[in-house]
Amino acid sequence: MAKMPLSVVVFLLFSAAFLAVSMAEIKSLVISDDARPMILFEKFGFTHTGHVTVSISSVSVVSTSSDPNPEASRLGFFLLSEESLLQVLLEIQQNPRFCVLDSHYVTHLFTFRDLSPPPNSRFNQSYPVTSPNEYSLFFANCVPETKVSMAVRTEMYNKDPNGSKDYLPAGSTQLPTLYSFFFLCYVAFLGFWSYTCWTNKQTVHRIHLLMAGLLLIKSLNLICAAEDKHYVKITGTPHGWDILFYIFQFIRVVLLFTVIILIGTGWSFLKPFLQEKEKNVLIIVIPLQVLANIASIVIGETGPFIKDWVTWNQVFLLVDIICCCAIIFPIVWSIRSLRETSKTDGKAARNLSKLTLFRQFYIVVIGYLYFTRIVVFALKTIAAYKYQWVSFAAEEIVSLVFYVIMFHMFRPEEKNEYFAVDDDEEEAAALALRDEEFEL
């Protein structure tokens, strides 16, 4: 094997250790003129009834070295468990020319020596996984200066007691039921919110309608996720539900960030329109969320086998961090403005109650972002592969709690201290906004 660059070793460690388990377990892809010494296809949690099927066709190996006929046994597919990953990396670091196909820590599937002779050059075989574990499917090219082209079809599944195939990993087979349950929770939440708005029509503002829309989109996103995982579970492919899932996920994320920003600015119930700097936050966040969702689709629908997969992960992470920071600014501006206003307008008690509410909202938003971005990732990393569903459940529970708290704090109610703004306050705020003197 050619000397493996350190970056490839890091990529192998990062991708196999932290790659989220694949969700569409029948995949077809094309590799064209690829010279990478190792390609990670996907990750899957197997039970003792697990199977993996790999089909390749239209295989060609082009050598740019003096040897036009590379040794076929030095190119092949294998499975690698997470426990064995560090051992393989240690072998590679000790001997950069070491071929991973020679390691006794990997589960060999086949090499190019098993292919049918040209011009067909194809292979199709199913393998039982007798040792339950979470495995990563790799292709290794241990021949220096060679480029490989091939069409690859992979199929991974576990068998249920009744003999049917379950294409979801061992730790994700509960997801259809989980998402269906939270869909019902949000439908009930939407019904209760609609009733609350109806019974308090006099204090309903445009932001409350956006909040209702957020609940509706979140519900649709969850039912699409449930159907997506259900069809993947029984057939191996999402049957188009993944398209609807990504559409509603995009709308939900953009709407959630928009609602948080607008609540933080006090739009519609504290002032009738936004200042220029608040509009700029929306102008920045919404396009970034478009980019983040494009990255999410590329990450979810392809895999680490594409050359730019790590780059897309980095783009998604960077954009998400920027958006999370951006939505904090309007809340901070509002807190600062209320603190300054309370010193001069003679309404210290009223401003103090609003200031307290904004501080509480700030803490709630920070807690939500911290848990969903850091704690959930930690759960996915440390949880055993059979219990990956726990991290998804934790994320949905925290999201639901966040929605309930946020909606309760800013509900349409006569006695809600945040909305109880008398006429002279509204006129003063509108005048200050027109003069661009009301810093928020």
UniProtKB/Swiss-Prot annotation:
One of its GO terms (cellular component) is membrane. One of its GO terms (biological process) is response to molecule of bacterial origin. It is a multi-pass membrane protein. GO terms for molecular function: G protein-coupled receptor activity. It is found in: Membrane. Induction: Induced by the N-acyl-homoserine lactones (AHLs) N-3-oxo-hexanoyl-homoserine lactone (3OC6-HSL) and N-3-oxo-octanoyl-homoserine lactone (3OC8-HSL). The chain crosses the membrane at residues 175-195, 207-227, 243-263, 281-301, 315-335, 363-383, 390-410. Disruption phenotype: Abolished Gram-negative bacteria-mediated promotion of root elongation triggered by the N-acyl-homoserine lactones (AHLs) N-3-oxo-hexanoyl-homoserine lactone (3OC6-HSL) and N-3-oxo-octanoyl-homoserine lactone (3OC8-HSL). Belongs to the LU7TM family. This is Protein CANDIDATE G-PROTEIN COUPLED RECEPTOR 7. The gene is CAND7.
